[in-house]
Regions:
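Gly/Ser/Thr-rich active-site loops/lids in small-molecule metabolic enzymes
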Residues: 12, 16-19, 72-91, 163-172
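N-terminal small/polar loop signature for handling phosphorylated ligands or for N-terminal nucleophile
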Residues: 5-67, 111, 133
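Short, acidic/turn-prone active-site loops that include or flank metal/cofactor-
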Residues: 19-23, 78-81, 122-127
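Generic structural signal for hydrophobic residues
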Residues: 2-3, 106
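Glycine-rich, mobile lid/loop segments that gate access to catalytic sites or pores
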Residues: 1, 8, 113, 117
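Short, structured secondary-structure boundary patches
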Residues: 33-44, 77-78, 138-145
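Phosphate-binding and adjacent anionic-ligand microenvironments
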Residues: 53, 91-188
Length: 188
């Protein structure tokens, strides 16, 4: 659905897209951005076709991850960093709530590199989302709640955990960079 009904009408070349017809059997690999086989399939497809970007979703599209044009995964701490960088452009200094298993390097990137505030909270996408909502109700600007699993919820999207929403923001950023002669790989 996403490739055909969202990306293609926007002018994206989806010819390298794979596994677009749902059959409920998942014969190719588990539809999971945390699954090694699934991420390898996306990476290999991006490399073999020369695509600029690859996107992967889980079955209900509430989690996503990406692959750059060199086949490098943008998942786990990487997807958190990318989502936070997108948010930082529009909301400098905001708080980002993540699950507790993020790395110290991610905290350094968010706080020192992007000028954001990072709050680690207990695992569970509902936990990080509820914490973000709570912070906002207390007057603390929090625009992003995200787990390393790829569950991402943005305030601008009513804190819905929506992998397609985050993927679309990544695709838009990649397209803008490409229009300026820059690949997303160059800014990761």
């Amino acid at each position: 659905f996403y490739a055909k009904k969202v990306l293609k009408p926007l002018g994206a070349d989806i010819s390298a897209s794979q596994f677009l017809e749902p059959d409920g059997m998942f014969m190719n690999h588990a539809p999971n951005p945390e699954d090694r086989e699934a991420m390898n399939a996306v990476s290999l497809q991006v490399i073999s076709t020369g695509a600029h970007l690859g996107i992967i979703f889980d079955t209900d599209v509430d989690r996503s991850a990406a692959v750059d044009s060199k086949g490098r995964e943008i998942s786990r701490n990487g997807i958190v960093a990318m989502a936070a960088a997108l948010v930082a452009e529009e909301h400098p200094g905001t708080t980002v709530v993540t699950d507790s298993i993020t790395s110290r390097q991610l905290t350094a990137f968010l706080e020192d590199g992007l000028g954001l505030k990072h709050m680690r909270f207990k695992r569970g996408y509902r936990n990080v989302i509820n914490k973000a909502i709570e912070l906002n109700s207390q007057g603390v600007d929090c625009q992003l709640a995200i787990e390393t699993s790829g569950h991402a919820a943005l305030k601008e999207n009513y804190f819905l955990d929506d992998g397609a929403y985050l993927a679309t923001k990544i695709v838009i950023k990649a397209a803008k960079l490409f229009a300026d002669g820059v690949m997303i790989d160059d800014v990761i």
